[in-house]
Amino acid sequence: MAIKAYRPITPAQRKKTTEDYDQITTNKPMKSLLKAKKQQAGKNNQGRITVRHRGGGVKRHYRIMTYNLPKDLTLTVEEIEYDPNRSARIARVQDQNGTYYYVLADTKMTKGTTFKTGSDIEVEDSSRMPLSNIPVGTFVYAIELTPGRGAQMVRAAGASAQLMAKEDGYATLKMPSGEVRKVLAGCEASIGTVSNLQHQNVKKGSAGRVRRKGIRPTVRGVVMNATDHPHGGGDGGRHGSGKAPRTPWGQLTLGYRTRHNKKTNKMIVRSRHEGKRK
């Protein structure tokens, strides 16, 4: 996969880059696996903004993804498709019974390739099996946190985790963030790397392209009024209050740790922040 650049016929095209879409084989999704997606604009059921900077953008249909494939299936890749709801490509696959699924596509998937799910299968690209059956050193994606719950980790474009060790019923994984953590060896994962490797190198190039993705502008707190942000106010403006930076709700930010889930600390062997400490 490559990145496509443009001749600067317009100012917006000067720094704009796009993906080349070479892996995609069709532009027509399967209607039975589509669902209407109502835009929430970052608001909850009470109409209050819970996620800022959301709203507008083009209309989309949601593709019904299957993150928990049944066991003992032989699946054939029918098409590789674009999905506007995620950074990775998706694969339309069919099992031996004629049932269709949408799954995350990896870098090795092409139209016509086959892969299997289950415990007693060969270790091949795209195969899905428990971590206990995967050799140490293998790169995996779409990893479960709880057996049978479906993939929750390593689903973004170009992502993969490496299986580092297996002992005492746990598998040790090195995550894309650099974190090393344990998960139950019975959790399933797919072998390979998520598709669309160059996604992180795409430059949007213009404000309009960002708005079409449903992202609204972000305003700095220092240019707001004092009632709207802890950094706001001041005659003529201030460029720093002399205090620690805070969020609009008064929480310390820019490096301040806000993680409270202490129950899973025992599963984290090495924090993703470890390499940043001096």
Residue ranges and their predicted role:
Residues 1-85, 111-278:
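Basic, glycine/proline-rich low-complexity segments that contact nucleic acids
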Residues 98-110:
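Beta-strand/loop nucleic-acid-binding surfaces
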Residues 85, 93-95:
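Structural recognition of beta-strand segments within beta-rich domains
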Residues 95-98, 176-177:
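Short acidic-glycine loop/turn motifs at beta-strand connectors
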Residues 95, 105, 165:
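Conserved strand-loop elements at the edges of beta-sheets that form or border functional pockets
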